[in-house]
Amino acid sequence: MRLSSHGKKTVSTSNNPVFNRIGLFFTAAILFALFLQMLFFLRPWQDIKETKVYTFQMDYRQVLKKVDLKVGDPYWRWAGQGQTINRRIKNDSMIRSLSLRLSKNGTAIIRVNENLTAGFVQIKQKWYRMDQNAHLSSKSIQPDGKTPVYTDFKNGSKILKKTITAYLSMDKVMRLAVAQIIYSPVKSSPNRLALVMNDGNLVYANPSSLAKRMDLYPKMVATMEEKGIKNGVIDLQYGGYARKFENSDDNLLSSLSSDKSKSSSKSSNSSK
């Protein structure tokens, strides 16, 4: 105890052991709470037990390989590593960004924001990858067989962009079933598309209704089989009906075959 300048008595706490102990106790409690929080965040006793990868096109194994994340990895290695994995895929042309979340049960959840592949376009006997915005790759690359090739479209045209949007809106099973998309306008249908399917059928549709109408495709194929038609035309422009190939359809397909043979012969000649 001491006297103030006004003659009043004051209590000094700087050397008071009781107050010092209380301050030390609260400091220790805060540090211990932070330690526990860090411990439960890193979970050094736990491993990654399961991985879940959400993609639109990419195979989940591709993503895990690029990130180098595996079941059995220590939990702490991946805790709070969202920015780290994004640095790993910074120059990857297929991925825009990744998000990583770890659940308390040891599940690593990865969500992928992809640069989608809409298909491939041939220019001067070289193939180029086309993304969801109709932008072409700077380097030539062979089609992957998982997305269609686009024929007779003008680069960057509205009809091309609408077609890409419609194609990417289709169910995954149906997207994989399409081998080629042709811009095939006729007087009665100026926006007509012709889709060459992997099963040998030809589909006519419009970009505005393509994604919705393609859901009818399996039923229409079944109808064709009931009629004894192995391969034919499924017209989805104004409803949905199936028929046999006609001369106009054969001419369309034969012209495509002719173009392919010409381009292949040119490329073989240029390589000699």
From Swiss-Prot:
Record keywords, A-Z: Cell cycle, Cell division, Cell membrane, Membrane, Transmembrane, Transmembrane helix
GO BP annotations listed: FtsZ-dependent cytokinesis
Keyword Chloroplast carried by entry: no
Pfam family of the protein (one): FtsQ_DivIB_C
Cytoplasmic side: 1-21
Domain POTRA: from-to ranges: 43-115
Ranges facing Extracellular side: 43-272
Cross-referenced InterPro entries: Cell_div_FtsQ/DivIB_C (IPR005548), DivIB (IPR026580), FtsQ_DivIB (IPR050487), POTRA (IPR034746)
Keyword Ribonucleoprotein appears in the UniProt entry: no
Subcellular location: Cell membrane
Membrane-spanning parts: 22-42
Membrane topology of the entry: Single-pass type II membrane protein
Entries under Gene3D superfamilies matching the protein: 3.40.50.10960
Gene Ontology annotations for the cellular component aspect, listed alphabetically: cell division site; plasma membrane
Chain positions covered by the region annotation Disordered: 253-272
Family of the protein in this entry: Belongs to the FtsQ/DivIB family. DivIB subfamily.
Function (record text): Cell division protein that may be involved in stabilizing or promoting the assembly of the division complex.
Protein name: Cell division protein DivIB
